[in-house]
Structure formats: C-alpha cells, structure tokens
C-alpha cells in the first residue's frame, strides 16, 4: 500500500516541488488548503500534477478543520510548509502571523497527538530565526535572534515542535531552511523580480527596480531543499537539520550572473546597470524597496545534513539562475 502524505502549503513554491517528488516516489499526496481562499494552482498546473493531488480543506487557525483533514486523509507524514507572512511584511498584521505561523503549528501537533501520534511531522523553520546572528556560518547550535513578528512566530513553532517530540515521543522535527528559489518563486521575491524583469526587458518593457544591491543571500534551489525535507523525516531519529548552500552572493552579483547567462553586455554606474551596446537602462534602485530592518549575514552550515542524511545539492547558483531564466523566457516570450 502506498504511503500517504499531507502537504500543507501545497500551492506554494516548496509545496509544489515536494508534491511532485512524493508523487514520483509513489506516495498518495493530499494538499491542505483554506476553503475560502481563491485557489492558486498555477504552480501545480505548470508542473502538470494538479489532477494527482487530492485537496482537503485545512485552515491553521481552525482546530476543527485540522482535525477533520487528518482524520479524513490518515497520513503517514505531514509536512507543514505554510506561512502567512514573510519577514518584514509580518509587521502589517503581527497577530495573524502569530495565530498562523506560531499557534497553527501547535494546533497541528495537538491534532496529530490526539488522532495518531505515530504520524511523522515536518515543520519548515527558517533562517530568519537567526536574525542578527553572532556567528557565521550558522549551525544547528547557533543562538536564535529573530527580528520580525514572522520570525518570532516561527521560533515558537520551532520550539513547540521539539517540545512535543520530547514530551510525547512523537517523530516531529524541523528543517531550518535558508533562502531557496526556483522558477516557482513568487514574483515579489528579488530573484524572480530579476529573472522575470529581464525576460520582459528583452521584450521592450521597463527597467527593473530593486532595493539594496549589496544584500547578501545564501540562495539554493527549492528542488534540492524538498529532498532534504524528506530525508529529515525519514532519518532514524527525529532531529533538526540546516539546509543551506553555505555560500552567499549579493543581489548585484545575482543580476550580473543573470545578464551573463542572457549574453547581455552591461556596465554599472553606481546603482544603475546599463546595456553597453546602447546605454539603455536595465536595472535601477529605489530606497522604498529596502527592508526597514535588515538581518545580519545569514549563511548556513549544512554539514550535519550532508553527513547524517547524505543530503546533496544538484544545483549551484549558476544552475539555479539558468533554470529560473529559462522558465521566465518561456512564460513571457509572447508578452
């Protein structure tokens, strides 16, 4: 009999890659989604797997809907990849971040404990937990210093997952995920702003407007990270693992690499990037796009995951950029 997995956040970047990977491994995959939220299946549609997902109503604010979803699907594994807000956006509705990203995980764990404590549970934690980290790179033992309501809520979720594991002997674990991108990344993230923006710029559209070009990120590929999630949940013992590349590049360097891939000769004049052939503006900046509270340098040490789980990455930064650029060129070739 096939294993069953409930993926909460199945319509997101990580959820679609995880669902695809699980389906390829023979799993029966259930996708948890809020009933009154407009369905956003574009990622699953683009991957061609929408019809293979069995959708169930699940709202992390509603304990009863969580219980109903778990009772209906009877999963062997539950992956919580849902998040209401990211980073500084959580300042707009801090209470909702708390109720969804923090207390929502408590509701999940309590439902699993009551219905079937043998269900394995994976919680997607975030490198934002480290905030202004006091050591670089960060390991599983680096102290946390969250810098936003989102990060505070995720820290509660991280700790309550460990608490339930220790108190009730549940197989519950967290993956501390550093930045990971893909063609399925949302358009408000800087990497997609760049790859989509350049695809449109090639079609005669406006220059790309960015924030701080010197911000450094540890960027990996979501496809690699969802494999790490599955390895974490299938380890001999439940533990926390960092998933990261261990390397950072700046936003400016990401732009440069993308331009190089597209064979666009360019030069920088301060924070403006122009086409060498005709001096046409490609990229500019606006202070309005700068984050009000920048975290410290976040770069993860995934030695533990590599050593204990055998986790390895298929994509380097150039492979990630190539994958994202080709996808956006296909999408916007007729724009």
Can you annotate each of these PLM segments?
Residues 24, 31-32, 58, 187, ...:
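C-terminal substrate-binding subdomain of Rossmann-fold SDR/epimerase-dehydratase oxidoreductases
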């Amino acid at each position: 009999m096939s294993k069953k997995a409930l993926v909460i956040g199945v319509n997101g970047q990580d959820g679609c890659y995880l669902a695809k990977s699980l389906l390829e491994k023979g799993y029966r995959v259930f996708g948890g989604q809020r009933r009154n939220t407009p369905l956003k299946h574009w990622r699953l549609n683009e991957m061609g797997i929408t019809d293979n997902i069995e959708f169930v109503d699940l709202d992390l604010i509603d304990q009863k809907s969580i219980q109903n979803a778990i009772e209906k699907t009877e999963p062997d594994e539950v992956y919580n990849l849902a998040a209401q807000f990211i980073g500084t956006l959580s300042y707009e509705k801090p209470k909702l971040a708390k109720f969804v990203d923090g207390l929502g995980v408590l509701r999940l764990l309590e439902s699993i404990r009551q219905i079937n404590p043998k269900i394995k549970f994976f919680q997607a934690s975030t490198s934002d937990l480290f905030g202004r980290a006091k050591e670089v790179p960060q390991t599983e033992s680096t102290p946390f210093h969250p810098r936003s309501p989102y990060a505070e809520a995720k820290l509660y979720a991280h700790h309550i997952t460990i608490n339930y594991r220790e108190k009730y002997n549940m197989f519950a674990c967290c993956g501390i995920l550093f930045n990971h991108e893909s063609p399925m990344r949302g358009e408000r993230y800087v990497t997609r702003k760049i790859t989509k923006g350049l695809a449109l710029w090639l079609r005669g559209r406006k220059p790309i407007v960015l924030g701080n070009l010197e911000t450094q990120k540890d960027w990996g590929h979501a496809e690699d990270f969802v494999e790490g999630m599955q390895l974490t949940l299938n380890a001999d013992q439940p533990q926390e693992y960092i998933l990261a590349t261990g390397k950072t590049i700046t936003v400016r360097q990401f732009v440069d690499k993308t331009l190089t891939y597209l064979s666009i000769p360019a030069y920088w004049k301060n924070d403006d990037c122009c086409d060498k052939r005709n001096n046409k503006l490609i990229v500019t900046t606006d202070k309005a796009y700068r984050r009000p509270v920048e975290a410290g340098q976040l770069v993860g040490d995934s030695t533990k995951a590599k050593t204990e789980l055998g986790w390895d990455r298929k994509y380097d930064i150039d492979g990630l950029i190539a994958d994202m650029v080709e996808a956006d060129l296909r999408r916007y070739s007729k724009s």
